[in-house]
Amino acid sequence: MLSNLVVTKQKVVLVIDELNRERIAPKFIGSLLHEQGQGADTIKALPTGVSLKHVATFEALIDKYANNNTGSTTDSNSTGFNVILPTLADLLCYQTPAFIFGFLNRLRRSDNVRRVFLWASPQHLQDPHADYILAGCEYLAELVLRLESDKLLSLISRKPGGGVSNRRYSCEVSKTQFKVTPLDGGLPAGASPKQPSPEAEQTTEPASSTFKIELDEDEVLARNALTLPYERTSEPSEGNIIYTPDADDDFDEEDPDEDLCI
């Protein structure tokens, strides 16, 4: 399911919608959270409309979460809240890009916020610097989901250790779930890998392998019959030195010192 890939430990999630479906954004994100067991009491949304013009609306959101977290000891609140922000197009109608970036950064640093979701449709961004604003949101996001078409999406995930993964998936929407399958031939999201059978583990190297690791019968016999110089034999024997004279050796049987007067 798509929720297995989106609802993770990554805190700031940016959804880039190439299909212009902003109207389903809150319902779509809420369904992903519910699939992962996130209760309604952990999902909070920022008011939309003219109220976004007032900075107090944003401040009240952060203060509310802080007060709820300190005044309650339930398990749902102790893990933090899931914040669903208005679409980026709505935010830009009332606030500057600098304010939006600062607010996103505050939510990212807040201990009372578990995840932040922001939906952006590039075609709906009327700002002349829309490309730079969207790039700034991607920089702040730890997970970027791009809906490229009805059957294709991509996912960029940044991990705390600095690693980045970029994968593409084919998607299939049914009445009950949003199923995705990696385009590189991997298993669908949420599927457990199949355990290999013992017979498959015992298979030998294919004949087309360029590196031969097995010996045939004749090679095994030749290897066993070979005795290396440093090998120890099972039968004890005395040490003998055998010298075979060469043809150039000149031995004189007479004593060369016989003629000396000593």
From Swiss-Prot:
Residues 200-211 have a biased composition (Polar residues). It comes from the Eukaryota. Pathway: tRNA modification; 5-methoxycarbonylmethyl-2-thiouridine-tRNA biosynthesis. It is found in: Cytoplasm; Nucleus; Cytoplasm, Cytoskeleton, Spindle. The keyword tRNA processing applies. GO terms for cellular component: cytosol; elongator holoenzyme complex; microtubule; nucleus; spindle. GO terms for biological process: establishment of mitotic spindle asymmetry; tRNA modification; tRNA wobble uridine modification. Residues 246-262 have a biased composition (Acidic residues). Keywords: Cytoplasm, Cytoskeleton, Microtubule, Nucleus, tRNA processing. Residues 181-214, 229-262 are annotated as: Disordered. Disruption phenotype: RNAi-mediated knockdown is pupal lethal. The keyword tRNA processing applies. Component of the elongator complex composed of Elp1, Elp2, Elp3, Elp4, Elp5 and Elp6. The elongator complex associates with and stabilizes microtubules; efficient interaction requires the full complex. Component of the elongator complex, which is required for multiple tRNA modifications, including mcm5U (5-methoxycarbonylmethyl uridine), mcm5s2U (5-methoxycarbonylmethyl-2-thiouridine), and ncm5U (5-carbamoylmethyl uridine). The elongator complex catalyzes the formation of carboxymethyluridine in the wobble base at position 34 in tRNAs. Binding by the elongator complex stabilizes microtubules and promotes their growth. Belongs to the ELP5 family. This is Elongator complex protein 5.
